[in-house]
Amino acid sequence: DQKFSLSQKDSLAGGNLDVYNSIYFQELKYKFQQSSVNDYFGQSFVQQEINDKIFLNTLNIFGKVSYKSDGLGAIDLGLRYIDDRYRLENFAIDDYLDNSKIINYKTTFLNASYKKRIKKFDLILNAENFLFGDNKSSKLDSELKIDLKKDNFLVFKYRISSTAPNYNHILYRSNYEKYNWDN
């Protein structure tokens, strides 16, 4: 993560202008092995060792410009690029499944947020919307916090979203006949 301050609030300038960027890479692996088929799970496609491996690699690049002043509040505008590669290696049932199937989603999102305190009210808005790519999800979060007497407050929250794809549902395969999504 990096943050650069282009201008800072002082007696002449009315606000702060910052640039922020972040690069994140994650690699996840899951391995399931069984020396032989277990009758508890029902019938299987083949009566041999089960050796499944699942891999998820994610590259997440985020950049934003942030402006903060007493009059306007805090405004952020940015872009997020996500590259997900998800694959399954299932060695026991090559004849039944296409093990070469790989999910490779590359998506760019537009991010915007706004925060402002007006007397006893805090207003927070966050949005992330699909621009182009494979993952057509978006979300909008809003929050209004009202300060009441003493240490009490009242919060109203609203969220609307279209979710990201469930990679497990899209790709999941099992050696057991009853544990596949498309039976």
Model-inferred region functions:
Residues L6-L17, K68-A74, K119-K120, K149-D151:
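Short loop/turn motifs that connect adjacent beta-strands in outer-membrane beta-barrel proteins
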Residues K31-N38, R87-D95, K136-S142, Y167-N175:
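Outer-membrane beta-barrel translocator domains and adjoining extracellular loop/strand segments
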Residues G15-I23, G73-L77, L123-L125, L154-F156:
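Transmembrane beta-strands of outer-membrane beta-barrel proteins
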Residues D1, D151-N183:
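Outer-membrane beta-barrel translocator/channel fold
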Residues K120-G133:
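Transmembrane beta-strand segments that form the barrel wall of outer-membrane beta-barrel proteins
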Residues S7-K9, Y24-K31, I82-Y86, F130-D134, ...:
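Structural signature of outer-membrane beta-barrel domains
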Residues Q2-D10, I61-Y67, L110-K116, S142-I146, ...:
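Residues on the lipid-exposed face of transmembrane beta-strands in outer-membrane beta-barrel proteins
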